[in-house]
Amino acid sequence: LFSEHHLSHAASAFYPSPFQNAAILTLDGVGEWTTTSLAIAKGSDLKVVKEIHFPHSLGLLYSTFTYYTGFKVNSGEYKVMGLAPYGEPVYADIIREKLITVAEDGSFQLDMSYFDYATGLTMTNKKFDALFGGPPRTPETELTQREMDLAASVQKVIEDIILELVSVAKSGMN
């Protein structure tokens, strides 16, 4: 028996809950191919109604900034989250204007010309580096205000997008 990654997340959130109806939003790096999904649950019926597929991923966007700020992908994301309160979201507009496009329905696409994670050995490329003023921070070197501001910026952008997705999910329930 095999269950899709995002459907498993949705089921494990809904079925033990006290709710009879729910909108379930699942976001992560990537499941089999899905990175973001919206499921609607009514009674015992659970159906995924919307998906966004790899390489377009809020989780991988966050992991890209984890890499760029000098931390290890898939284990250092909490450090980026911890840095965010010490910075200002001065790069948020650049992220919104250059790296990600968000549609009215909450769906999004990354401009993959800035990223190498789908085809290369690193998360970013020279175009990404130029956008943020230089190469990634070397791991274990001193943190600067730039890393704190980058963390605050990606945190703000992703929080805003998630709020849009939640609004879409809520409207899908009505």
Language-model-derived ranges and their functions:
Residues 1-174:
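Short acidic/glycine-rich loops and adjacent helix/strand connectors
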